[in-house]
Structures are given as structure tokens and as C-alpha cells.
Amino acid sequence: MPNTHTQHVQISEPNPVNTLSTPSKRGHRHRRSLAISGDFDFLKQPAAIVNLPPPQAAENCPSTAPTAVSSTLSPIRYNRFPCKTNEDAGTLDLPEPRFYPLSPKNNLQTPSPRFFISEEPSFSSPVKGVPDAIINLDDALKTRPRSFKSHRRSESAPPDLEVMVDKGNCAAGSNSMIKEEEDSLIEPESKNEYYEQKLPTALLSPLRPSLCVSEQAIDVDDSALNGSPTHHNHGMQNANARNSNTFNSLKIKGQKQRYYHYTKQLPLTVGCDSQSPKEQRSAASMTINQAMTPSSLAYTPSKLASTPATPVSFYDSNADINLESDNFPLKDNPRYAKDGYPKKCGNSQLNRVLDSDKRQDFSGESRRRRSGSPISHMQHRNLIDNMKGRRNSNTINSIFNYKSQHYEMPYDDMMKNENINAQSMPFSVNGVNNENSIGGVITRADDAPLQHSVVKSCTPDGKEEMNRLKSNDSNEYSKSEGQIRTNSQLSKDILMGEPGDMVDLSSFVNAQRKASNETGDLVFSLSQDDDALKTFHASNSAATSNESWCISDDALGKQAQDSEVRRKRKSKLGLFRHIFSRK
């Protein structure tokens, strides 16, 4: 009975040309990548395998004979042979495999694979089977390709340093060797002077000769320090510099000398000034000098007390000033009499007297004794100021004594209105009473009490004239010289909307019809009387000037108005408001 569990598999015959070629992996056929992955099928196969006879067709085999495929996957290639059929139909034997592996001992000679080898390997090693190295690493380190660019730093210390020494390419000679510090101490003074005069021309180390530093630190401008008590120290410092060693590795000595040169020039007092403009020090140097510690003072010489910075004496013999007395006599100089200075000056005027006297009397003397005296004139003056501040503890040691003062300016509307009226009216009448009639208009003199005041009137010519002006009430509307004279503007209560005096509004109804007629008559009278007033006052230049200004001294002393003036003011004010409201 045939086995029904067996599965018949039909395999299509592949092309024999395609079997010799390796299927593409990763989409390319690169030999090196295939060799690394372990696929060696890219080697050429011998011609015997290609000339094999074609396999038999699958139809020659019976249907009962199933085809078996080996399930093992290996890179070993199998040869294809025709399947063998069994004559007996009743018996079913296991089919023999169609693929048999090729024996490596067969007659097919395959060439030996040689990957990346340009020549045959040589076996010179004592170990059997170990070929010689293909790449010599020693040659790779020393060989430079054409694209290689050497670096200066790498060339300064090449690996084959002995070659350069043998060739004698060293720049330093036997006569240009640097002396050690211990050797220079043993050498005599003559050799030291020789090295100071002539330095070696070869490349020196960071060590510098101490002579250059010491001479730069010591040799200062002799004109500025001539006659000073510290000038005699230069000879001793130069001798010490010559006796010292030639090369100072840390340059400590030069730093000490430079520090000494700086500190001996700085003043030690708090408020002292510099002696000359070229010796001025910054504020930072002054603060560093004030906080000088004993350790920093150890580098200064023992004769520091005689330096210009030392406050030797507060009292100067050339200035005869007694600080203990409150008042001191001064010479009867006509300059003080002219300026109004008293002959007895207190402590408050001490600074001004010192500034004026010592600048004139001691200016030449201070220049002469600036180089030789232990204290300068400017330092002496500052010390006097400090002593005065210490003796009088209540006084403040400051020049800026500003005290705020309150200036109360009286603000009055009457004064302001009077000034405005004086500027707006360029003409003033002198010697003419208010009772005079011009153009048929009469002004009563008893409407307001007359007050005469003396006023200065300034004209553009620069002259001052005395005028008698008759000032009336600031709130009165009076007709003078043929025109309406407004001595004041509208009151502040009306302009600002504040409640003021009671006004009868019924008068506005009756005055509406008369407003147009009165306005026309008013304009006509103003234009008619304007020419007469100009001809009448042509002789008075001070009064007719448009730029003249008058200030009344009695503007604040106004008296109260009577009931008739108030009634007229209310009626005229209502008419004035009605005229402007219609426009």
C-alpha cells in the first residue's frame, strides 16, 4: 500500500549557467565583501563541472517515486545525479539522494585562493607554518608619503635625533654655553664685568642678567631727584648690583629694587599732594600706600625717615602763623582794604588767607626749596587744614558747605494783574487829572481813592525816568482818555468756575437788545479817540514805548470799594460777558 503521508515535491530545473554564478547578496557583487562573509563561490570553477551532461527529466521517474530534498544547508556544493527507480512496483524503497558532495580528493584541480597577496609568502620564521609579515611596520613609520607635510614642532624633536647630532647641526657652540648659577658665584669680579659688557650671542634661556633690571630701576631722572636726601643711596645700590650674581633666575632682586623705587616716591600722609605734576600718583597707589604693612616696609631702607614722604615737622619756619590763637594779625595790605577784608581774621578765613598769601609771597621760595626741604608747600597747607579740623570738632572738614534756603515769593493776583496792565498799556499820563474831558467822556475821580507811587520806567534807550502814575482799583472798569481802560482781566472765580459774588441774571434779558447798539458806539468811540491820544502823548518817549514796564509798590495796599463801585462793576461785567458770549 503506498504511503499516503509522503509529499510529492516537484523542483524546476535551474539553468546550468546560473548555478555557476553566486546569487547577489546585499545588491552588489564585491569580491572583498563576499570573501569576508565566507562565500567563496566567486572563484572560477573548472571546465569539467561545466561540461557535465544535462540531468534527466522528471517525467522519466515514476509518480510513485517521491523526490526528496536534503534539508541541510551548507556552503558545500553537491553534484546532481539521476535518480534510480525501482523495478518492483509493490515494494517502495527510500529514494537515494540526488545530490552527492564532491570529494576534495577527486581529479578536479582547483586553483588555490590567494587573497590580497601580491607575491608568494616566504617562510623564514623558525616556527613552522608561520609566513613572514606582508607589511613591515618599521618601514611604515619611517616612510613618508608624498602628501605628507611635516610640522615644525615634530621636526624639532625627530625620532632619529642621533643622526642630527652626528652631522653637527647643533646651533649652540662650545663658546656660547650658558653658565650655571653656582659657577658664576665662584668667578671673580673681572669675569662678571666682562659678561656684563658683552652678552653671549647664542640663544639664551629665560634667565635675564640682573644688571639690566637694576640699572633701569635705579637710574631715574637726576634732574627731578637732584638734591633730595635719597640721592646718596644710588652709589650703594649700584655697588650692590655689580657684586651680585650675573644671572638671577627668579629676578627677585630686580623686583625688590623696583618696589623700593616706587615706595620711596609715594607720600605716607593721608591728604598730601604730589610735589610736581610729573610725580603725581593715582588714587589706587595712594590707598595701597596708606595700608602698608610692616612686612612691606621691610624692603625699604633704614633711612626712610628722611624721604620726602615722611611728615618730619608740621610747623614750617618760613610761614609765621600762630595756629593756637583764634585771631592773628595780618599786614595792612591795600588789597585787603579794597576787597573789604577785616584786619582780624578768624579760623573760618584761615584757608583763604593761606591761599592768597602763600601763592604770592612763597611761590618762588617754594620752588627753590622743593628739592631740598623735607616737606612741600602743598603738604604743609593740607596739614594745616587737618589740624584745624581736629581742633574744632564741630567744624566739618569739607569745602562744600551748601545750606538750602527757602525763598517765599508772595503770589498775589492783584500784583500780577497790575504788571499785566502796565505792560499792555504803553502810555501813561503825567500831569493830567482824571477830571479832564477828552472827546466828551468824563471820568469821575471819586470812584476810587487815588494812590500815587514812585515808579522807575525803563526805556529801550537805557534811561531811567521817575513817573507819577495814578493807579486805580484792579477790578474797576473806567473810561479814561476816550477809551475803556481795563485794569484787570476776568476774576479767578469766574474763569475757574468757582462760586463768587451773586450776579443778577435778569439784567441779561434787558441788555440783549441794547448790546448791539452799545457795541457799535463803543467801537466807533475807540477808533475816533485813538488818533487824538497818539498826537497828545507823542512828546513823552518813555511813556509811549511799547517795551516799557512799570511795577507799582503799593499794589498790595488797596482799600475796599464802596457799594456804588460794586454795583457798576456787576452791571458792566454782565455786559462784558454777554458781548463775548455772542461771538
Curated annotation (Swiss-Prot):
Modified residues (Phosphoserine): S393, S398, S516, S552
Record field: compositional bias (Polar residues): 1-24
Record GO biological process: fungal-type cell wall organization
Record's comment on post-translational modification: Phosphorylated by CDC28/CDK1.
Organism name: Saccharomyces cerevisiae (strain ATCC 204508 / S288c) (Baker's yeast)
Biased composition annotated in UniProt, kind: Basic and acidic residues: 332-342, 354-366, 461-479
Annotated keywords: Phosphoprotein, Protein kinase inhibitor
Highest taxon of the lineage: Eukaryota
GO molecular function ontology, one term from the record: protein kinase inhibitor activity
KW Phosphoprotein (keyword) present: yes
Protein role: Overexpression affects chitinase expression, cell separation and budding pattern, and increases trehalose accumulation and heat resistance by inhibiting protein kinase CBK1. Overexpression also suppresses temperature-induced hyperosmosensitivity and sensitivity to cell wall degrading enzymes. Overexpression of both LRE1 and PBN1 confers resistance to laminarinase.
GO CC annotations on file: cellular bud neck
Protein name in the entry: Laminarase-resistance protein LRE1
